[in-house]
Swiss-Prot record:
Any one Gene Ontology BP term: cell-cell adhesion
GO cellular component, one term: plasma membrane
Gene behind this protein: vezt
Lineage per the UniProt record: Eukaryota, Metazoa, Chordata, Craniata, Vertebrata
Family: Belongs to the vezatin family.
Domain of life according to the entry: Eukaryota
Protein name according to UniProt: Vezatin
Organism (species): Xenopus laevis
Subunit structure and binding partners: Interacts with myosin VIIa and the cadherin-catenins complex.
Bias kind Basic and acidic residues: ranges: 758-767
Localization, UniProt: Cell membrane; Cell junction, Adherens junction; Nucleus
Principal cellular location given in the protein's record: membrane
Length: 774
């Protein structure tokens, strides 16, 4: 074959042939090998190899047997015991790393690709307690040593008389035997001491791995506590009892500030020391180029590219505050992800370094090659630093978790025992009201679903007895919740009245009753069971935003509200903007609890197609109720209960105030009106919301008697009375949360009307329908 022809020839089954086949190239000439010659050559070589291997195996076994009996090769046996200890330490370390699950899935897959023996080596002796040889196996003498001892003792026992001539023979023998015994004892002691040292280092490896995992879990718990505190205090303070309401006014970054700082300091310190240990392994204990590829390591990335103050050895608190956006939750989460990746990378490189394949092929007593020296040289101060960081973070976490958020000092508890007791009773009543309303809402949804099924059944002309019994049973289930809700409402109002008026005598407390026009008191109703804050309530973990970010600011433009000063209105505006921002963060942090399809389904279950909330028009007076009769002229009874509901969003929750139907302002005194209108520093009365060029509010709402003004001033000055805000939130979150959702139009409900209606009635009806659609 010429040289020019050789360039175009590709041998079959060669690497070039396989490569070209993978690329899809077939326009080349294939030169197949002679298969018969290959087969003959392989068979001949195989037979020769088999005979040679058999001969070598027989000879090697004989030599090994003789060596085992030879007393001059005991040094090699000693080195083999040290080698067994070395392999045992490596296997024990690998088992600890794999069992503690400190490696992320990507690093496990990379180890399986680079060195599959590590995964199998860590699982070879899972049923055994230890990979290291026992002290008994180390101190056990071999056959030659046992034979020498047996022969010597037999000769001593058989010797009958001692003389000077015999002492010349047995004296040197005794000296040699004593020297042999001392050397054997020293060697056994050295091996046992090495085994104890390796056991200590195995315990250190196990402690370091477990501390790393515990620190990761503790940081995860701390971040969850920070997240829950921020979420609950801003968006769910009035719906859940997990966070005190007094912290709702703080900025998001001010919640658990000490815990945020502790998380940043400890995670940053552990990240830096783990990164230095990984770089030290790469520099002083290099492996092959495939394992030490720079693309497989985070530690080779410059720290200045990572940010968050990691490039500096010591960073001040002010610089850390600026670099992490006031120790914000997103920055802490990024730092936590960096720590997880760096920690897993350190243990991955350590596992590859301690692999049995990287051990010395033959027994070696060089201290630098022993694995426990490698371990101590690599980690240095890492275990102590990691333990100190975990202790600091655990102390801060326990303080904010168990002391700051739940307990009070003994002095405060003694000084404010009465006030705290009253607040706890009030909170228990409101909490019970929330749970009863939630259960009531669920039962009402089920009842409405059953009614829809019965109404949609065209074959059923009349209600069957079975359906009647079913409906009666459903109503019987609903009745206790309604009665309990009324009782909780009345008890909460009475608690507020007691806290405001502070009666001197306790005799009138039991006889005192609160009047409520909206919710009449049910007679002969047993008191409802109150649920304490300490009781486990599964619903507290359901974090779902009951607010709509699309609410405009037109609802809050009223300047005629007499309860708030301009500074307070500005503060409420800032809180509404903060609530919208927190809501956007909640969608990214917590995820959506329900899809849009499920929300539409809930809306259809909660409200029928006629249950449309009709807001007041600006040009209509407050006391005018004629549009109620024109919403559904055919069925006037459906208009009841859908008037005067103007929700407003404050602090991330919806507050709804219901006005009674056809209220006679002429027959209503000021005190009754003050009881109807809730007063709180967190709620703006919606009935006074009108434009500036319209008629002002009625006199009873703008001009108040001195007694009412004094009472409102006391309520306004008290920072502990936020009952109306919380109660309105419970009702809004459980009953009228979907009034801000986009309205679904299933058809024009005015198409089926008769064409013989008069022109005035048609005009009024069209105006009302446009109001509904608007």
């Amino acid at each position: 074959m010429t040289a020019e022809f050789d360039e175009e020839v590709v041998f079959e089954n060669s690497p070039l042939f396989q490569y070209l086949q993978d690329l899809g190239h077939t326009d080349f000439e294939i030169c197949p090998l002679s298969k018969e010659e290959e087969r003959l050559a392989e068979n001949g070589q195989g037979k020769q190899d088999v005979h040679t291997t058999e001969k070598k195996s027989i000879i090697s076994r004989t030599v090994e047997f003789l060596k085992s009996w030879s007393p001059f090769l005991s040094k090699k046996k000693k080195d083999e015991k040290i080698h067994l200890l070395e392999i045992g330490f490596r296997l024990e370390s690998l088992r600890t790393i794999l069992q503690q699950e400190v490696l992320i899935q990507e690093d496990v897959e990379l180890i399986e690709l680079l060195d599959p023996g590590i995964l199998s080596a860590g699982q070879t002796q899972n049923q055994q307690n230890d990979h290291l040889p026992t002290l008994w196996s180390i101190a056990t003498p071999n056959i030659w040593e046992t034979s020498i001892l047996f022969v010597f003792l037999s000769a001593v026992a058989a010797f009958q008389s001692w003389s000077i001539s015999s002492s010349l023979i047995w004296g040197p023998s005794l000296i040699l035997f004593a020297a042999f015994t001392v050397l054997k004892t020293l060697h056994t002691w050295r091996s046992a001491r090495l085994r104890i040292i390796l056991r200590k280092y195995c315990t250190q490896v196990e402690g370091t791995v477990s501390n790393s995992r515990a620190f990761t879990n503790l940081v995860r718990k701390a971040l969850r506590l920070i997240q829950e505190t921020e979420v609950i205090s801003r968006g769910f303070t009035l719906v859940s009892a997990a966070c005190p309401y007094g912290k709702a006014g703080q900025h998001a970054s001010q919640h658990l500030l000490g815990l945020r700082k502790a998380v940043y300091r400890t995670v940053r310190t552990n990240f830096r020391i783990s990164r230095l240990a990984t770089l030290y392994m790469l520099k002083h204990y290099p492996l092959n180029s495939e394992i030490d590829n720079v693309t497989n390591y985070i530690c080779v990335v410059p720290l200045k590219d990572l940010g968050l103050g990691l490039c500096e050895e010591h960073v001040s608190e002010e610089d850390a505050h600026n670099l992490t956006d006031a120790f914000s939750l997103p920055a802490l989460k990024v730092l936590f992800q960096l720590w997880i990746g760096q920690s897993s990378e350190f243990f991955r490189r350590l596992a590859l370094l301690l692999s049995p394949e990287n051990a010395s092929q033959g027994p070696s007593t060089s201290p630098e090659q022993l694995p426990h020296f490698i371990w101590s040289d690599v980690v240095q101060d890492l275990p102590h630093t990691q333990a100190a960081c975990m202790a600091e973070l655990k102390r801060s976490y326990e303080f904010y978790r168990y002391f700051e958020t739940q307990h009070q000092s003994g002095l405060e508890r003694t000084a404010k025992r009465k006030e705290v007791g009253e607040l706890n009773n009030l909170h228990g009543a409101v909490r019970s009201l929330q749970l009863h309303l939630k259960a009531l809402l669920n039962e009402v949804i089920v009842l409405e679903d059953e009614l829809d099924k019965l109404s949609s059944c065209k074959e059923m002309q009349a209600v069957t007895p079975e359906a009647s019994l079913m409906l009666e049973e459903k109503l019987r289930i609903i009745q206790p919740h309604v009665q309990a809700s009324n009782t909780c409402w009345e008890e909460a109002l009475c608690q507020v009245e007691r806290m405001v008026r502070k009666p001197t005598t306790k005799k009138d407390t039991g006889k005192y009753s609160c009047e409520n026009l909206n919710y009449p008191v049910v007679s002969n109703v047993p008191p409802a069971m109150r649920i304490e804050d300490r009781d486990p309530v599964p619903e507290e973990q359901i974090l779902e935003a009951y607010v709509e970010e699309a609410v405009t600011d037109q609802e809050f433009n009223s300047e005629e509200i007499y309860l708030f000063s301009p500074e307070e209105r500005e503060r409420q505006k800032r809180e509404r903007e903060e609530s919208r921002r927190v809501l956007q963060e909640l969608k990214a942090v917590l995820g959506l609890k329900a899809s849009e399809a499920e929300r539409q389904k809930w809306k259809q279950l909660l409200f029928s197609e006629h249950a449309v909330i009709t807001p007041l028009l600006p040009e209509e007076p407050v006391g005018h109720f004629e549009p109620l009769l024109s919403i559904y002229p055919e069925e006037p009874h459906k208009n009841l209960g859908f008037y005067g509901e103007i929700p407003s969003e404050i602090n991330g929750t919806e507050h709804v105030k219901d006005a009674p139907i056809q209220v006679d302002h002429g027959n209503m005194n000021h005190e009754d009106e003050a009881k109807i209108c809730p007063v709180s520093e967190e709620v703006e009365p919606a009935s006074c919301k009108e434009e500036e060029d319209e008629t002002p509010c009625p006199a009873p709402r703008t001009v108040l008697p001195p007694a009412i003004k004094e009472r409102l001033a006391r309520i306004h000055q008290s920072s502990d009375l936020n009952f109306t805000s919380g109660l309105a939130t419970q009702v809004a979150a459980r009953s009228l949360t979907f009034t801000f959702l986009q309205e679904q139009t299933f058809g024009d409900e005015w198409d089926d009307d008769d064409d013989n209606e008069d022109h005035d009635h048609d005009k009024e009806r069209n105006n009302d329908s446009s109001q509904l659609e608007g």
